């Protein structure tokens, strides 16, 4: 299909909103058994659009980099990828009202060296996605501490692959958020262990610990409508109800 503009309309006369996702961050957003995007981020956004009858929401699964470039080109109107906030991205995109809170963990092989800080990881190998906040944090550490650099392998593989590589020893560690860790461990029970990332170091990953939907700069009106709906969903307890269905020990801003 051709690129959608914000004015494209469906047969029903509704404005079609295309939401793009990398769909590889379970339990937040992933491809479900029916080959459609599923997870907390998707359930929340669907609940938002239930309150916005003038719009028809469509999802497109693509790689992480294409989510961002597609927002810039106007192909997509919303990015759905459990986005954290950072200044660079904040200058390029509009952010929604936060709908979730995140905490990050270092993941290492069970029984091996525990990593409790970036300092502990000096000289070790890390695997992560290109352009995602945890990889950016490792890059920032390396720039500031060239004598304690961490070896980075970039991959667009699913997070489960990163955990498998840590478990089999081909990578020393990865960094993911706690809810994802719990979700993958419940499903696969990898031979790995976790340590919480200290709060001061977590700020290297994200300037705050919330998750957001992102929009192109020209979608201020859509962002306002989404924000209004998100606040209503928080106040009426819907966000908490959706989070209870997820496999995690998490805190949602609805809770």
Where are these regions (language model features)?
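Extended ligand-binding regions for polar small-molecule ligands
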Residues: 42-52, 112, 119, 123-132, ...
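Periplasmic-binding protein-like
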Residues: 22-24, 100-108, 188-230, 249-255
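Ligand-binding clefts/hinges and TM-proximal coupling segments of bilobed small-molecule sensing domains
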Residues: 55-58, 133-155, 192, 227-255
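Bilobed "Venus flytrap"/periplasmic-binding protein-like clamshell domains
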Residues: 23-27, 37-50, 105-160, 178-182
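Gram-positive cell-envelope targeting signals
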Residues: 1-12, 16-19, 59, 78, ...
């Amino acid at each position: 299909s051709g690129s959608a503009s914000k004015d494209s309309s469906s047969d029903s006369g509704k404005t079609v909103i295309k939401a793009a996702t990398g769909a590889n961050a379970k339990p937040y957003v992933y491809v479900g058994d029916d080959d459609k995007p599923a997870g907390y981020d998707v359930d929340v956004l669907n609940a938002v659009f239930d309150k916005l009858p003038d719009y028809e929401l469509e999802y497109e699964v693509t790689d992480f980099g294409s989510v961002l470039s597609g927002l810039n080109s106007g192909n997509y109107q919303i990015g759905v990828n459990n986005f954290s906030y950072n200044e660079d991205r904040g200058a390029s995109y509009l952010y929604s009202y936060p709908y979730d809170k995140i905490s990050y963990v270092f993941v290492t092989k069970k029984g091996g060296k525990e990593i409790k800080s970036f300092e502990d990881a000096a000289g070790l190998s890390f695997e992560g996605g290109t352009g995602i906040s945890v990889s950016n944090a490792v890059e920032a550490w390396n720039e500031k501490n060239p004598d304690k650099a961490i070896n980075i392998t970039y991959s667009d593989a699913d997070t489960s692959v990163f955990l498998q590589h840590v478990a089999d020893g081909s990578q020393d560690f990865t960094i993911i958020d706690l809810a994802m860790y719990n979700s993958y461990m419940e499903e696969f029970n990898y031979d790995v262990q976790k340590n919480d990332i200290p709060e001061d170091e977590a700020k290297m990953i994200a300037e705050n610990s919330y998750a957001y939907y992102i929009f192109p700069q020209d979608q201020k009106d859509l962002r306002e409508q989404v924000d209004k709906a998100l606040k209503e969903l928080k106040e009426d307890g819907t966000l908490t109800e959706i989070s209870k269905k997820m496999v995690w020990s998490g805190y949602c801003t609805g809770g």
